[in-house]
Amino acid sequence: MAERFKILVLNGPNLNLLGQREPELYGKQSLDDIADSLGAIAKQHATALDFRQSNAEHQLIDWIQQAAKDSVDYIVINPAAYAHTSVALRDALLAVKIPFIEVHLSNIYRRESFRHHSYLADVADGVICGLGARGYEYALQAALTTLNNTDN
């Protein structure tokens, strides 16, 4: 079956430590577990899924810029701490004009006050936080619903 859509899932700093780092906040699933789960959902929907992680802001920006060249249809991004600091990430997402959903494993509004502001939230299609790894699945389902509705 031909793939109907391309979705890029980006993960920011320290998410490579999922399952080890503060499991009471971020859960016990590893990033590989999340990638496998999303890959299975994408396959059911004939969707190409590219799942990546970097601790480097410039790498995330390079991938976002490349996404436009690769005709990516949608981005799901967990910017991690870059949500609260990176105007450059915001600018890259605005520049490519690819719709995106912001995801956070923990509820950023139950945490330190500096985490309450996201530079991406007001330009995202939506924000999902505090639902753990399921938040990624909800974001992917929302992206697929949006793409299917615009594909008609």
From Swiss-Prot:
It catalyses: 3-dehydroquinate = 3-dehydroshikimate + H2O. Keywords: Amino-acid biosynthesis, Aromatic amino acid biosynthesis, Lyase. Substrate binds at N78, H84, D91, L105, S106, R115. It holds the Pfam family DHquinase_II. GO terms for molecular function: 3-dehydroquinate dehydratase activity. The gene is aroQ. Signal peptide: none annotated. Catalyzes a trans-dehydration via an enolate intermediate. GO terms for biological process: amino acid biosynthetic process; aromatic amino acid family biosynthetic process; chorismate biosynthetic process; quinate catabolic process. Homododecamer. Its EC number is 4.2.1.10. InterPro entries: DHquinase_II, DHquinase_II_CS, DHquinase_II_sf. The record marks R21 as: Transition state stabilizer. PANTHER family: CATABOLIC 3-DEHYDROQUINASE. Pathway: Metabolic intermediate biosynthesis; chorismate biosynthesis; chorismate from D-erythrose 4-phosphate and phosphoenolpyruvate: step 3/7. The active site is at Y26, H104. HAMAP family: AroQ (MF_00169). Belongs to the type-II 3-dehydroquinase family. This is 3-dehydroquinate dehydratase.
